Amino acid sequence: MTKRALISVSDKSGIIDFAKELKNLGWDIISTGGTKVALDDAGVETIAIDDVTGFPEMMDGRVKTLHPNIHGGLLARRDADSHLQAAKDNNIELIDLVVVNLYPFKETILRPDVTYDLAVENIDIGGPSMLRSAAKNHASVTVVVDSADYATVLGELADASQTTFKTRQRLAAKAFRHTAAYDALIAEYFTAQVGEAKPEKLTITYDLKQAMRYGENPQQDADFYQKALPTDYSIASAKQLNGKELSFNNIRDADAAIRIIRDFKDSPTVVALKHMNPCGIGQADDIETAWDYAYEADPVSIFGGIVVLNREVDAATAEKMHPIFLEIIIAPSYSEEALAILTNKKKNLRILELPFDAQAASEVEAEYTGVVGGLLVQNQDVVAENPSDWQVVTDRQPTEQEATALEFAWKAIKYVKSNGIIITNDHMTLGLGAGQTNRVGSVKIAIEQAKDHLDGAVLASDAFFPFADNIEEIAAAGIKAIIQPGGSVRDQESIDAANKHGLTMIFTGVRHFRH
């Protein structure tokens, strides 16, 4: 009995050669619409879908394959006599191979001129139905959704006139992933259209971006997936200009770095980062000086770190960066001379380019955190804050220089691991206390790191001070200005201590925990 294949594809890459080889192997081919036209024009003889169903395509192509003659041919179990008899009684011929990819819904909704009606018209119904029928009956039917599998299928058909069960099972799993991801993308689109903030089912889809050597540690397997609808300002979408593949830890650190730099849009800024914590942030009138400040903030910790700059990297800045061992440099652009300097004898240095003008769109994405047996979802900590809404709670008001430094410190503290303390002046970080289980411990660490640079320094805390002992430590170090959220039942004790030592202290009313 002549075997039959059904081919209906929107992506016609490689399909002509695939179909020709099928014909050479003695297969009949059923086809639809544009696929049939393409195959016929290439000299590949095909059977029209309406010759199989007995019905013409109708309703602008919405109904063409949803028919028992198609799905019966796909779903009939070859090992069940009753199925075969039912097919015979109803003049249903079996279909042994399905090659289908779906209407380009993703590509459609990514178009800047897409309308709601156009998006709806690009929701495939018949294609997923055929794929699911074929995949369910993978004991007998081969289903192909990816042109990368054409060669494997043809090779097995040429060798043994049929594919192996192992291949059919693998391709069935791939087909179910394909239809599930397709439906998830449609669900995501409609959820956004109706403004549903807390859907009872969370459906998101990601595509494999990179198979990784290992995860956070060598004993951990890992892979990198990118959103099906890519975010332009993201490490997943970054253009890599030089260096090795990014590691798991590289990606996490780089992601943290590009989040931090978003808050420093107004001035040339450089952020140096290590293990998800900023080790140096510098801000100036030009990017070279901003680098000087970021490097000076902690010339030890920057070794092996990640650096992100929010202006084009020029030759002068590149000359200063080149001698330092860095894992990654990220910037919106690089001058030709700067790129030549940075890549000289630095084949492993990862250099990334990102569209910084797309930062705003990246801020509206949800954050997902995996926990055992579940997933936490929250919006990003990108709340707009206006210093005019802050409250000076002490007798002494901040000086103009202190006010500028406190604003800088408050931007920086948001990305320090809790309990987080940061000491800065008005243009660079000076000391960092991160990840301690008590706040006074973080205060002591930050002061120790900044001890030689405390003249004119200010201090920021990501959450309130639970006890006045923090204020005593800060005052003893000679720091005169503090910014914190407030909100402790003992706030007055901290205020009294600050007044006693002549400190100025601001309450912002916004906490910035980061775990």
Curated annotation (Swiss-Prot):
GO-annotated cellular components: cytosol
Regions that span the bilayer: none
MF GO annotations: IMP cyclohydrolase activity; phosphoribosylaminoimidazolecarboxamide formyltransferase activity
Hydrolase listed as a keyword: yes
UniProt-listed InterPro entries: AICAR_Tfase_dup_dom_sf, Cytidine_deaminase-like, MGS-like_dom, MGS-like_dom_sf, PurH-like
Annotated catalysed reactions: (6R)-10-formyltetrahydrofolate + 5-amino-1-(5-phospho-beta-D-ribosyl)imidazole-4-carboxamide = 5-formamido-1-(5-phospho-D-ribosyl)imidazole-4-carboxamide + (6S)-5,6,7,8-tetrahydrofolate; IMP + H2O = 5-formamido-1-(5-phospho-D-ribosyl)imidazole-4-carboxamide
Segments forming domain MGS-like: 1-145
EC numbers: 2.1.2.3, 3.5.4.10
SMART domains the UniProt entry points to: AICARFT_IMPCHas (SM00798), MGS (SM00851)
UniProt pathway: Purine metabolism; IMP biosynthesis via de novo pathway; 5-formamido-1-(5-phospho-D-ribosyl)imidazole-4-carboxamide from 5-amino-1-(5-phospho-D-ribosyl)imidazole-4-carboxamide (10-formyl THF route): step 1/1; Purine metabolism; IMP biosynthesis via de novo pathway; IMP from 5-formamido-1-(5-phospho-D-ribosyl)imidazole-4-carboxamide: step 1/1
Example GO biological process: 'de novo' IMP biosynthetic process
Keywords: Hydrolase, Multifunctional enzyme, Purine biosynthesis, Transferase
Domain-level remarks: The IMP cyclohydrolase activity resides in the N-terminal region.
UniProt record similarity statement: Belongs to the PurH family.
Name of this chain's protein: Bifunctional purine biosynthesis protein PurH
Species annotation: Streptococcus agalactiae serotype V (strain ATCC BAA-611 / 2603 V/R)
